[in-house]
Structure formats: C-alpha cells, structure tokens
Amino acid sequence: MARLKEFYRDTVMKQLMEKFQYSNVMEVPRITKITLNMGLGEAVGDKKIIEHAVSDMTAIAGQKPVVTKARKSIAGFKIRDDYPIGCMVTLRREAMYEFLDRLVNVALPRVRDFRGLNPKGFDGRGNYNMGIKEQIIFPEVDYDKIDALRGMNISITTTAKNDEEARALLSAFSFPFKH
C-alpha cells in the first residue's frame, strides 16, 4: 500500500474528523483523482513534439497518457479538426498516492525560487489546480533527453464540499501553501 494512503487512513482522517466534527468517517474529504494535462500548441508544426511530451508524461505519471485532439478547426491558431494538441493522464488509487508523494516530497522542493503554492488555486468546490513551468523538476525525466521545457497543469479532485475542507486535507498531506 502507498505510504501516503496509509498516512491518510491512520492520521489525516482523525485530524479532519476532529477539526470539522464529522459524525461519519465517510464524510471525511479524500482525494479522488489527479489529472495531469500538457497543452502543446506548438505541436501544430511538428508531430515529434507530441511523442516527446508523451514520453515525458509517461515517465512522470507512470502510465501512458491520452493524446488530446482539437475539437474544431481554428484558422487563427492554424489548427484543424483532430489535430493532436496535447496529452493528459488521470491517476487514481495507488498510482495517485505515489505521484502525490513524489510531487510534494521530491518535485516541488526542486522548483527554482519556490515560495509555496498559490492558495488561490481552489475552485470553490473543493478541487485544487496548479501549474508547473518545467517538467524537469521530476527526477524521472532525463535532463539530457528533453528537447524543450514544457509545463503542465495538475488538477487535484477531492470529495471536499468547500475550499476550507480541501485546504485542510491538502495541508495535512504537507502541501506547502503560501500564507
């Protein structure tokens, strides 16, 4: 079992039960999924970019991403229907907890000039979104093999009812929020 999953079950649930006075353990918020999304607008000119992004994302997430395609043609962006314009991967269960562990304890401390995560990333319904500017903060990505620095969006979906509960949940997992 993943280290953070055990930590959640043994420690975080008890903390949140006391803090929010839940009457049932099923009321305690939990993380349901983590979605990684990499938008690749520059892939319009070069199809190799998608392959590199997919290999980076596979190394980071531990599972193969889905290539996202344009839904409709937009002449201003030089894209047509079904052009590959990004890739995404959804992590659940064990893989999700493993990724969360690596994100908080390994990747975020490697970000240059890191001052904490923006507390405004909550959406009002208990979910958190954050952006990463470079994929090289993950140790799984080989620095010598990357062709360009690419960022990604990380979406953490929880069962929390509001931002306060979600923030308490993520803080319990030692997310480094700015004050």
Swiss-Prot record:
Cellular compartments per GO CC: ribonucleoprotein complex; ribosome
GO MF annotation, one: rRNA binding
Keywords for the protein's UniProt record, in alphabetical order: Ribonucleoprotein, Ribosomal protein, RNA-binding, rRNA-binding, tRNA-binding
InterPro entries: Ribosomal_uL5, Ribosomal_uL5_bac-type, Ribosomal_uL5_C, Ribosomal_uL5_CS, Ribosomal_uL5_dom_sf, Ribosomal_uL5_N
One BP annotation, GO: translation
UniProt KW Glycoprotein keyword: no
Family designation: Belongs to the universal ribosomal protein uL5 family.
NCBIfam families: PRK00010.1
Function: This is one of the proteins that bind and probably mediate the attachment of the 5S RNA into the large ribosomal subunit, where it forms part of the central protuberance. In the 70S ribosome it contacts protein S13 of the 30S subunit (bridge B1b), connecting the 2 subunits; this bridge is implicated in subunit movement. Contacts the P site tRNA; the 5S rRNA and some of its associated proteins might help stabilize positioning of ribosome-bound tRNAs.
HAMAP family: Ribosomal_uL5_B
Subunit structure: Part of the 50S ribosomal subunit; part of the 5S rRNA/L5/L18/L25 subcomplex. Contacts the 5S rRNA and the P site tRNA. Forms a bridge to the 30S subunit in the 70S ribosome.
Descriptive protein name: Large ribosomal subunit protein uL5
Taxon lineage: Bacteria, Pseudomonadati, Pseudomonadota, Gammaproteobacteria, Chromatiales
